[in-house]
Amino acid sequence: MSYMPAQNRTMSHNNQYNPPDLPPMVSAKEQTLMWQQNSYLGDSGIHSGAVTQVPSLSGKEDEEMEGDPLMFDLDTGFPQNFTQDQVDDMNQQLSQTRSQRVRAAMFPETLEEGIEIPSTQFDPQQPTAVQRLSEPSQMLKHAVVNLINYQDDAELATRAIPELIKLLNDEDQVVVSQAAMMVHQLSKKEASRHAIMNSPQMVAALVRAISNSNDLESTKAAVGTLHNLSHHRQGLLAIFKSGGIPALVKLLSSPVESVLFYAITTLHNLLLHQDGSKMAVRLAGGLQKMVTLLQRNNVKFLAIVTDCLQILAYGNQESKLIILASGGPNELVRIMRSYDYEKLLWTTSRVLKVLSVCSSNKPAIVDAGGMQALAMHLGNMSPRLVQNCLWTLRNLSDAATKVEGLEALLQSLVQVLGSTDVNVVTCAAGILSNLTCNNQRNKATVCQVGGVDALVRTIINAGDREEITEPAVCALRHLTSRHVDSELAQNAVRLNYGLSVIVKLLHPPSRWPLIKAVIGLIRNLALCPANHAPLREHGAIHHLVRLLMRAFQDTERQRSSIATTGSQQPSAYADGVRMEEIVEGTVGALHILARESHNRALIRQQSVIPIFVRLLFNEIENIQRVAAGVLCELAADKEGAEIIEQEGATGPLTDLLHSRNEGVATYAAAVLFRMSEDKPQDYKKRLSIELTNSLLREDNNIWANADLGMGPDLQDMLGPEEAYEGLYGQGPPSVHSSHGGRAFHQQGYDTLPIDSMQGLEISSPVGGGGAGGAPGNGGAVGGASGGGGNIGAIPPSGAPTSPYSMDMDVGEIDAGALNFDLDAMPTPPNDNNNLAAWYDTDC
């Protein structure tokens, strides 16, 4: 048919299309179909159910319709070139070759070559039903074939195993070698492999073969078979029960690479999956042989060896010591320096991480250059390698505080603080805390590379994650004291808006280890006068006083308990922190803050002076020293001096004049001197004599005296600067990750331990010879009323001369000439570490 012209289409009054004139004798259905083939293919949808659409206004056919076969004239069909006989012949041919088509699809290998089979596929992209069934049928065929072969292999191996066992036990090495190779070939197939591992006699024969044979080929074949068996749990158990581990360990000395590979991989599989293998390898001397193998240079082989070492050393102190005695740390560090194969570096770092918690291995790793070698990989793209290196560095860092040449590591750690990984930041902060402890060069380096800014940001971002805030605060505490850039660090904390965040850490829910670290940091920050006002405004003084009162109450409660129950518990602990440490820290921080007049007024308002006075009676000399120090600052104001005197401080202060602790005696003298400013002249004169007799003692060279004239208990208190002590168990522990049961160290807070008479200007109107001073025998100076008290006798002129004495005539001293210059800061002695701890604010 042809398209009908548009003008021939007429519209009736009922708004329906009238079909064009059609030839007679055409059914209604055919008329409808032909009507659909008009020039626009418009369809009301009534007859066909198609969606109604408006003909295109452009008069063009839709693009989608142009390629549709239905668009062609209905008269266009298959060419009528076949006769009925030909059609019948084709149908018969297709019917006769149906089985061949099925065979070609499912079993193509059964067809003879050259046979042509007519295809029923008209569209190459549309497979026939037979073709669609061919893939699963092929899979089924292969499964059946494999099952048949598996059964054949299993039967063959089962029949051959008894004979092969006899051959393996033969005395002729050639026979043994041939039998071992046959067994090795059988072990490559799964069915026969299961048959071998199910025969304990066969496995035992293989173990004997590798133990007794001197033939390399038979050894290689036998150990290769054991290697194949070790991929199955049943095979591992068979090897273990047959005593295969000692034989495999013996092969670790073989000069043949393939034998070594088979032996180490089999042992590795045993260590991973077979219970009891670790002890068996240790008893067979496997650790020593594996450490020796670390000298090889095949990275994949080394990766397996190091993983074996990690498995053996983890949780076993004896294994760690064996690795140390065999020279393991040096070889492991060499590997970290020499290779870039990620898996090898990762497995080696795991071994070092395990060894780094061993107090014996730790210094050996550090001495071998482990810190620098691990630092080389902090920029690696492998997160697991970086994490292991950081964990290991954290464990080693407390033993590396004196190591030189860590500038690159410190810079990398500061950069790592910006990571979004909590574990990475935790480790980096802990390492920085330890490496900046008692190391002025490291402190300066961290400050110069922006460490203070990074640590403040870390604390701000950490929120309530104490596993991050505690080491970060400790690191800041180290950076803000006792090095050339400490003042810059103190200012940098303020300029980076860190003061408010740090003070907030004194609030609950912070735990005592963190609070202790924050107290020390605030004390150091207070050394910068510019920080006094901001600290006060953020409530630092209020929180310090609150913590002091709580800790003081706990210590007093503990004392009462000891007195009433006879308990032997010497002090109160909270989260591993002694409350005496909190008392000393808070009082020391208030001492430095009290240098500013507004802070002194606020401290007086807190009604805390009575506690300071009571602390003068404390048996711990460091607490006596900080208490006397804060009273010395508060006594600078008349109001403070009056309150101190009203609280009865004169008596204990006078007693402390005779303390063997130079700092305590000097502060006590300074407080008494300031309290006497409005006293009568007679009182001042007696006080000056008492002070002179007390300060000019027979201890001529106390700074150079090794024991400082103190008992061993006090010298233990004046211990060196502590490294960061991690509180939480996340990550591998270091020596400093435990709080329980450690001795109480009297950390110094740098509270102006003034040399006796240093900065004490004493003038005399009468010139005279130098007078030494032995402690006077007199009693205390009078109390608030300025009354009695025996004045110490004037020492004889022949007494030894104190190095701190001035040229004076003691009998003619003008008390008004006494002037304590409390701003004078003596230099810590370089030859006395115990005494230098007074100046140690890092702990």
Curated annotation (Swiss-Prot):
Entry superkingdom: Eukaryota
Modification after translation, per record: Phosphorylated on Ser, Thr and Tyr residues. Level of phosphorylation varies both during embryonic development and from embryonic tissue to tissue. Sgg is required for phosphorylation and wg signal negatively regulates arm phosphorylation. Hypophosphorylated form of arm increases in steady-state levels. Phosphorylated directly or indirectly by CkIalpha which stimulates its degradation.
A GO molecular-function descriptor: transcription coactivator activity
Chain positions found as Phosphothreonine: 650
ARM repeat locations: 159-200, 201-242, 243-284, 285-326, 327-368, 369-410, 411-449, 450-496, 497-538, 539-584, 585-608, 609-647, 648-689
Tissues expressing the protein: Isoform cytoplasmic accumulates at low levels in axons, at high levels in specific cells along the CNS midline and in leg and eye imaginal disks. Isoform neural accumulates in the axon tracts of the CNS. Both isoforms accumulate in the peripheral nervous system.
Gene3D superfamilies: Leucine-rich Repeat Variant
Modified residues (Phosphoserine): 688, 694
Keyword match Repeat: yes
InterPro entries: ARM-like, ARM-type_fold, Armadillo, Beta-catenin
Pfam families assigned: Arm
Membrane topology value: Peripheral membrane protein
One GO BP annotation of this record: chitin-based larval cuticle pattern formation
Stretch forming the signal peptide: none
A single Gene Ontology CC term: plasma membrane
Keyword Cell membrane in annotation: yes
Localization annotation: Cytoplasm; Cell membrane; Cell junction, Adherens junction
Keywords noted in UniProt: Cell adhesion, Cell junction, Cell membrane, Cytoplasm, Developmental protein, Membrane, Phosphoprotein, Repeat, Segmentation polarity protein, Wnt signaling pathway
Family: Belongs to the beta-catenin family.
The protein's assembly and partners: Interacts with Mer and Moe at the adherens junction. Interacts with Inx2. Interacts with alpha-Cat. Interacts with Myo31DF.
UniProt function note: Isoform neural may associate with CadN and participate in the transmission of developmental information. Can associate with alpha-catenin. Isoform cytoplasmic accumulates through wg signaling; arm function in wg signal transduction is required early in development for determination of neuroblast fate. Arm and Abl proteins function cooperatively at adherens junctions in both the CNS and epidermis.
Protein's recorded name: Armadillo segment polarity protein
Annotated source species: Drosophila melanogaster (Fruit fly)
Gene responsible for this protein: arm
